[in-house]
From Swiss-Prot:
Gene: rpsO
Family: Belongs to the universal ribosomal protein uS15 family.
GO MF annotations, alphabetized: rRNA binding; structural constituent of ribosome
Summary of subunit composition and partner proteins: Part of the 30S ribosomal subunit. Forms a bridge to the 50S subunit in the 70S ribosome, contacting the 23S rRNA.
Described purpose of this protein according to its UniProt entry: One of the primary rRNA binding proteins, it binds directly to 16S rRNA where it helps nucleate assembly of the platform of the 30S subunit by binding and bridging several RNA helices of the 16S rRNA. Forms an intersubunit bridge (bridge B4) with the 23S rRNA of the 50S subunit in the ribosome.
Taxonomic source organism: Helicobacter pylori (strain ATCC 700392 / 26695) (Campylobacter pylori)
Name used for this protein in its record: Small ribosomal subunit protein uS15
Keywords: Ribonucleoprotein, Ribosomal protein, RNA-binding, rRNA-binding
C-alpha cells in the first residue's frame, strides 16, 4: 500500500524544480497525490477501514493546504502543477 522507493524517486524526478530537490511544494503535492490514489483504491476494496479513511482525509487536507500556498505565492506554478497531476481547480 505504501509507495516503494522506485516510485517515489520517479515522482521526485518528474516534479523536482532543480537537482536533488526532494522537499519543494510541487514534489510534496505529487507524493501526497500518489498516496491519496493508493489509499482511495484500498478504501474501495475495504470500505469499513475507518482508520485509513481518517488518514486519507488528513492527506487530502495537507495537499489542499500546500496547493493553496502554491496558488497564493506563484499562480503560474500552480496551474502547471494541477494540469500535470490532473487535479481540478477549486
Amino acid at each position: 500500500m505504501a509507495l516503494n522507493l522506485e516510485k517515489k524517486q520517479e515522482i521526485i524526478k518528474a516534479f523536482a524544480t532543480k537537482e536533488n530537490d526532494t522537499g519543494s511544494c510541487e514534489v510534496q503535492v505529487a507524493l501526497l497525490n500518489e498516496r491519496i490514489k493508493l489509499l482511495t483504491e484500498h478504501l474501495k476494496a475495504n470500505p469499513k477501514d475507518h482508520s485509513s479513511r481518517l488518514g486519507l482525509l488528513k492527506l487530502v487536507a495537507q495537499r489542499r493546504n500546500l496547493l493553496k500556498y502554491i496558488k497564493r505565492t506563484n499562480h503560474a506554478r500552480y496551474v502547471v502543477l494541477i494540469e500535470k497531476l490532473g487535479i481540478k481547480d477549486r
